[in-house]
Design a protein with these regions (language model features):
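Aromatic/basic-lined ligand-recognition segments
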Residues: 120-239
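Secondary-structure junction/capping motif
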Residues: 16-22, 116, 243, 253
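Extended, charged low-complexity segments
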Residues: 230-300
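Short, extreme N-terminal segment that most often corresponds to the first beta-strand
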Residues: 1-45, 140-164, 292-300
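Internal, hydrophobic cores of structured domains that mediate oligomerization or house catalytic pockets
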Residues: 35-36, 41-43, 65-168
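Short, intrinsically disordered low-complexity segments
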Residues: 22-80, 84, 225-233, 238, ...
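Charged/polar, solvent-exposed surface patches and flexible loops
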Residues: 25, 92, 96, 286
Length: 300
């Protein structure tokens, strides 16, 4: 579910072209573009589209589509549920675009009505209340095997305690605090490299863990956001030493890798991911040695 605003410049000639970096700077936003796993690639844009977020209160991201800017047409949207701060940011972005374009009309696709910038600002409390109700309904839905939200920087799988708490919450304070806290960390959010065998067509997921870098890894090799429903049959991990510009010998079975991490102060990140503390070269070499003694290793 989303709130989508179509913005059209009214003047017939000399359409104003807005660029993503300038809009981000004017509103105090950061921006990037999602990869295939809904992990944000910072400071990138694709075909005039990007995801905006405010670094001081990171939510689910505001999608901007300026692919038809030469026609004086733009679209911005936010996902529901989202945080009150992000709704405020959305209204600010709409106001900035309206100001840059001069005379413009704004139309909400979902509500099938026009809005002015002032109406958006005045409606923030109502929009936030609807978002909170949507969060309640989302968390109360027992048909979901898991509750996953795409956030501004990466996906988030709700833990059982958050699902329970947000199913009956009366405000968005903890929701906003949690989403920002998860995304404000300076971490590497692991993404797999998917390879398919020519003979069996089986798909393998390959991950890389680097030294001295706090990292978020899925508990299972297939634990990435997979809207294409690809069937991953096996997973492997490789250790990379950036300081020496080389990888340690071997690729190790993913399940064994996760089991061996139990002694390294690993913590839960969300229901499907763990937070691995920065590991030194010596620790990676030692871990590789343990895994090298197990079965199923493949040579790199």
């Amino acid at each position: 579910m989303a709130f989508t605003l179509q913005i059209r410049q009214k003047k017939l000639f000399g359409k104003t072209t807005l660029d993503i970096p300038s809009l981000a700077q004017a509103c105090g936003f950061c921006y990037g573009s999602n990869n295939d796993f809904y992990i944000l690639q910072e400071n990138e844009q694709v075909g005039g589209t990007a995801v905006f977020y405010h670094p001081e209160h990171i939510g689910r991201g505001i999608f901007f589509d300026g692919s038809k800017s030469r026609e004086g047409y733009y679209e911005i949207s936010y996902n529901i549920p989202t945080t009150k701060s992000e709704i405020t940011d959305f209204a600010r972005l709409a106001g900035e675009i309206e100001s840059c374009l001069g005379r413009a009309e704004m139309y909400c696709v979902e509500e099938e009505r026009a809005f002015t910038g002032r109406e958006l600002e005045q409606g923030i409390e109502d929009f936030a209340a609807f978002s909170r109700k949507s969060l309640n309904q989302f968390c109360q839905n027992k048909e979901f095997r898991s509750h996953i939200l795409t956030l501004a920087r990466w996906p988030y799988t709700l833990t059982e305690d958050k699902t329970t708490a947000w199913g009956t919450c009366t405000d968005l304070f903890d929701f906003e605090r949690t989403l920002h806290g998860l995304q404000a960390r300076d971490v590497y959010y692991a993404k797999p490299r998917l390879l398919q065998k020519n003979d069996t067509k089986e798909i393998g997921a390959f991950y890389a863990l680097t030294e001295e870098c706090e990292s978020v890894f899925p508990v299972r090799a297939d634990g990435f956001l997979n809207l294409s429903e690809l069937k991953v049959t096996e997973g492997f991990v490789q250790f990379v030493l950036y300081s020496e510009q080389r990888a340690l010998e071997g690729m190790f079975p993913y399940g064994q890798f996760i089991e061996e991490l139990s002694g390294y102060d690993v913590r839960q990140f969300d229901a499907d991911h763990i937070l691995i503390p920065p590991m030194t070269k010596a620790e990676l070499v030692k871990l590789a040695g343990k895994l090298r003694g197990g079965e199923g290793m493949i040579q790199s």
